[in-house]
Amino acid sequence: MARIVLWRHGQTDWNTVNRFQGHTDIPLNSVGLFQAQHAARELAALKPTAIIASDLLRTQQTAQALSELLNLPVQLDPRLRETHGGSWEGRTGDENRKEDGENFTRWLTGGDIPAGRTGESRSQVAARAVAAINEALLVQHETVVFVTHGGTSRCILGELLDLPVEKWGILGGLANASWSILETHQNHISGKWLLVEHNAGTIPEPQMGDFDGDVNA
């Protein structure tokens, strides 16, 4: 059996104002650091064999909390980064609705279009992130924690559960420092994945669970 944990990073200051982070390298705030430590104590009970994180600071800081408990190194993979948001990065949801309303609304409601016109589509994010997971599972066959982002985790879930991209929005977004768990008893590349937990964790400062949750990922 292979088991993967998709763990979203803790809160940042940009999360609190719904500002699109994307590839912008924003650190955790004090709440986010607390969330990471709190969640790490629960995730340690799963006895993961590897921790693999996006190379952005907010995910590295989150992963470090679990690394210190388990004495496991954090492996970095930029393919686990958040969606590149193009012109939307650094702007709030309200600003993007005002300045690029038609495209932003289409993207929020599930359109598989480039974020911020020059950024990534959801299918592009899923392709790179799932490739990273598949490669990791070639050498790690037990429980692997992937520390990633709200938008990216939704794309991974949609792809692994074989949902059409326009339906990925039915998967509520992960709150900061919360996680989802998937398992397969088959080949991890060609087999079926089962979602056994979603948005798990008892973490303060919950975030939005609809497509708007991608904005402050």
Name these PLM-found stretches.
Residues 2, 83-95, 158-217:
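Acidic, low-complexity terminal tails and accessory targeting/binding regions
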Residues 4, 142-148:
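Generic beta-sheet signal
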Residues 4-5, 11-66, 116-130:
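Loop-to-helix element that buttresses phosphate recognition and phosphoryl-transfer chemistry
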Residues 5, 75-77, 196:
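General small-molecule cofactor/ligand-binding pocket signal
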Residues 19-27, 91-93, 112, 212:
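Short glycine-enriched, charge-decorated loop/helix-capping segments at active-site entrances
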Residues 39-105:
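Phosphate-coordination/substrate-recognition cap region in phosphate-metabolizing enzymes
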Residues 44-47, 136-142:
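Glycine-rich phosphate-binding loop signature in dinucleotide/nucleotide-binding domains
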Residues 102-124:
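Short glycine/proline- and acidic residue-enriched helix-loop micro-motifs
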